């Protein structure tokens, strides 16, 4: 029973982390480098007024330029545990996150529903896309200022950091996106308890097309990895 509870807790943590991954994924530009994380420091300058608006406009433009993405991700949990996998994204509305073994999770959005399949627990959790953070960035038009509550926009050297929270107030915690040269490199999610989950990226490309079968819900197709 204890093992099952621990597995369930990790599964739900993964779902939250992937929701955060999806929140940021459309901003990815092509890069083969893993993410670099900036620690908070006195060198961070908070942007205000015209500078803030200009930075957000540039990020929104990059977000809206994306049609399809695929690449690798590494998720680091609050306890230091790590999981990696492949992700696929096609706007509007479609996502797929495949975790490498020994993780047993598959998360798919088909444009209307987000489903998480855990093969170890033999469970599938579903929720409407519109009720998740994914709906904020998978539509035809992305506007971070409108879709989320921006807490802070800051800069250090060539890095721009955007910290945001759910505008509706239904989800506690914050996400900090870290951009360099217009490309998203990493982000941290901090929940209501202060627990931090980090996502880093590598081998991100913009394919000309993706197999639509990647975005079928896991109850319909095999949860095995598709190539």
In which residue ranges do the predicted regions lie?
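Compositionally biased, proline/threonine/alanine/serine-rich low-complexity intrinsically disordered stretches
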Residues: 9, 26-58, 64, 213, ...
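Gly/Pro-enriched, hydrophobic low-complexity segments
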Residues: 146-147, 155-227
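Bacterial N-terminal signal peptides
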Residues: 14-24
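Flexible, surface-exposed loop/linker segments and immediately adjacent secondary-structure boundaries
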Residues: 121-160, 164-167
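An acidic-aromatic
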Residues: 86-136, 198
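Extracytoplasmic
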Residues: 64-68, 82-84, 90-94, 101-102, ...
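Bacterial N-terminal signal peptides that target proteins for export
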Residues: 2-16
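A short, Trp-centered hydrophobic/proline-enriched beta-strand micro-motif
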Residues: 61-78
């Amino acid at each position: 029973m204890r093992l099952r509870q621990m597995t369930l807790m990790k599964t739900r943590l993964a779902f939250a982390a992937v929701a955060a991954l999806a929140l940021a994924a459309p901003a990815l530009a092509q890069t083969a480098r893993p993410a670099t994380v900036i620690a908070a420091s006195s060198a961070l300058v908070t942007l205000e007024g015209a500078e803030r608006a200009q930075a957000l406009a540039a990020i929104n433009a990059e977000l809206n330029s994306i049609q399809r993405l695929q690449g690798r991700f590494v998720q680091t949990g609050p306890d230091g545990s790590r999981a990696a996998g492949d992700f696929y994204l096609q706007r509007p509305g479609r996502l797929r996150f495949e975790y490498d073994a020994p993780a047993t999770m598959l998360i798919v959005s088909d444009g209307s529903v987000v489903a998480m399949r855990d093969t170890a627990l033999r469970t599938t959790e579903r929720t409407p896309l519109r009720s998740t953070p994914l709906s904020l960035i998978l539509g035809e038009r992305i506007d971070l200022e409108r879709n989320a509550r921006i807490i802070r926009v800051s800069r250090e050297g060539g890095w721009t950091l955007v910290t945001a929270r759910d505008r509706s107030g239904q989800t506690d915690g914050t996400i900090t996106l870290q951009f360099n040269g217009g490309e998203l490199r990493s982000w941290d999610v901090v929940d209501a308890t202060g627990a931090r989950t980090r996502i880093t990226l590598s081998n991100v490309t913009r394919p000309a097309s993706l197999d639509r079968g990647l975005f079928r819900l896991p109850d319909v197709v095999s949860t095995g990895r598709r190539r």
